[in-house]
């Protein structure tokens, strides 16, 4: 009689990205390596390179997720006043306090290691929702 083989868990692109993003939040972007992501995800490095061409592609995905995370954070940040840019500034400061590693990645990192395609501060703050443009219109 043959033994029943246990079904292997599939390591998805979402699981890899979620793991790398969580590592960035907890430990900092510099600690996101293929071996460390694989260890945290409970797999070998093979699934990482099956879904990502190379680590640069994964790093870009983590960076994009961090930028989207900041935009979500800002959109949910309480609007306490009508002074233009005050809410944006307060959200920026609170994000730095609460998400130190993501803040460093987005706004402090000089990207000398070439780990990601860095956006300008304006691109991150403005986002698809036009946050900076919205604040400028409030000032008029």
Residue ranges and their predicted role:
Residues 1-11:
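N-terminal intrinsically disordered/low-complexity leader segments
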Residues 15, 19, 23-57, 61:
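Helix-turn-helix
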Residues 16-24, 66, 70, 92, ...:
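Short hydrophobic clusters on alpha-helical segments that form packing/core surfaces
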Residues 24, 57-66, 73, 106, ...:
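Alpha-helical DNA-contacting segments of helix-turn-helix folds
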Residues 60, 64-87, 124-131:
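Amphipathic alpha-helical linker/stalk segments
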Residues 85-109, 115:
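Helical hydrophobic small-molecule/effector-binding pocket
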Residues 110-140:
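Amphipathic alpha-helical packing segments from all-alpha helical-bundle domains
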């Amino acid at each position: 009689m043959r033994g029943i083989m246990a079904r292997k868990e599939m390591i998805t692109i979402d699981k890899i990205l979620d793991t790398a993003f969580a590592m960035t939040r907890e430990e900092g972007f510099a600690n996101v390596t293929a071996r460390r992501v694989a260890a945290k995800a409970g797999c070998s490095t093979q699934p990482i390179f099956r879904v990502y061409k190379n680590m640069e592609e994964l790093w870009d995905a983590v960076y994009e997720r961090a930028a989207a995370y900041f935009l979500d954070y800002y959109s949910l940040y309480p609007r306490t006043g009508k002074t233009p840019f005050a809410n944006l500034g307060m959200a920026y400061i609170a994000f730095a306090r609460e998400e130190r590693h993501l803040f460093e990645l987005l706004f402090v990192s000089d990207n000398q290691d070439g780990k990601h395609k860095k956006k300008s501060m304006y691109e991150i703050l403005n986002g698809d929702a036009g946050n900076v443009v919205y604040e400028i219109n409030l000032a008029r």
